């Protein structure tokens, strides 16, 4: 009986050590491939010099990285902007905070069918992200170009139900953000997040018919639970991601498609 108990404890220890959550000196960070995982890869060697084994787990959706960080499967994530996190925390009850602000990805409007938004036909099919904040963000961008009017042009949670004027009778199709680049041939235009535009070969500066201005509030952040956000390793990662060296890397690699916005946030 005692032998069985020892075996059971040993098995439990093995399972725990092999679990998805990181051990001391290791940070497991969930990230979308571009540009987030690429930026993390850039600081990986510097993190190792600080004694941190930075492990990057790639995701292609906007839900699982937050759930995994909240339940401890990840130490944190790097894929979302602050307004998205705020809404996610409210809607899903997760306990996540912003660790640092790293960069801004201007959202753009793309098309395989027209070269200018002036050529957008009556009744055109417009693809937008189906998550609340990015859907609202896309509608505010379209409103800024005069294509539609919305009830409150400052409300990041605006939905299609808040459209007050639609002179071109645009039809909106809400899809998962990651699917929008692949759906371009079936749409007249699509509003696409940069982290999904870049892997599809779309550059906001060269290919977008309309792009957000430099004053965008949608700063991309590293998020974690409060305890992990305050950890020495996470704070060291935040310093690396917000350094001038990383800002230089972002500027040179993405040529304005991604804009550095380095700032370490206060954890309460």
Write out the residue ranges for each language-model feature.
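C-terminal segment of classical bacterial N-terminal signal peptides
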Residues: 14-23
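Short helix-initiation/N-cap motifs at beta->coil->alpha
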Residues: 56-67, 154-182
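Beta->alpha turn/N-cap motifs
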Residues: 58-62, 72, 77-86, 103, ...
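A conserved helix-loop-strand patch within extracytoplasmic ligand-binding domains
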Residues: 99-148, 247
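Periplasmic-binding protein-like
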Residues: 134-143, 241-261
């Amino acid at each position: 009986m005692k032998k069985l108990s020892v075996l059971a404890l040993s098995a439990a220890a093995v399972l725990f050590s092999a679990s998805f959550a990181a051990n001391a000196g290791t940070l497991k960070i969930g990230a979308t491939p571009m540009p987030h995982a690429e930026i993390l890869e850039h600081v990986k060697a510097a993190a190792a010099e600080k004694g941190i084994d930075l492990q990057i787990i790639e995701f292609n959706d906007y839900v699982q990285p937050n759930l995994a960080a909240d339940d401890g499967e990840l130490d944190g994530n790097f894929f979302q902007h602050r307004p998205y996190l705020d809404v996610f925390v409210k809607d899903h009850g997760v306990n996540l905070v912003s660790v640092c602000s790293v960069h801004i990805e201007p959202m753009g409007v793309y098309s395989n069918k027209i070269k200018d938004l002036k050529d957008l036909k009556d009744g055109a099919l417009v693809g937008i992200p189906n998550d609340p904040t990015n859907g609202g963000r896309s509608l505010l961008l379209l409103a800024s170009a005069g294509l539609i009017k919305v009830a409150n042009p400052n409300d990041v949670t605006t939905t299609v139900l808040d459209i007050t004027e639609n002179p071109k009778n645009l039809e909106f199709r809400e899809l998962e953000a990651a699917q929008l680049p692949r759906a371009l041939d079936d749409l007249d235009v699509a509003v696409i997040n940069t982290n999904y535009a870049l892997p599809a070969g779309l550059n906001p500066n060269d290919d977008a018919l309309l792009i957000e201005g430099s004053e965008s509030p949608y700063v991309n952040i590293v998020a974690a639970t409060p305890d992990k956000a305050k950890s020495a390793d996470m704070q060291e990662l935040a310093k690396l991601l917000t350094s001038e060296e990383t800002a230089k890397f972002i500027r040179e690699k993405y040529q304005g498609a991604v804009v550095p916005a380095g700032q370490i946030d206060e954890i309460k």
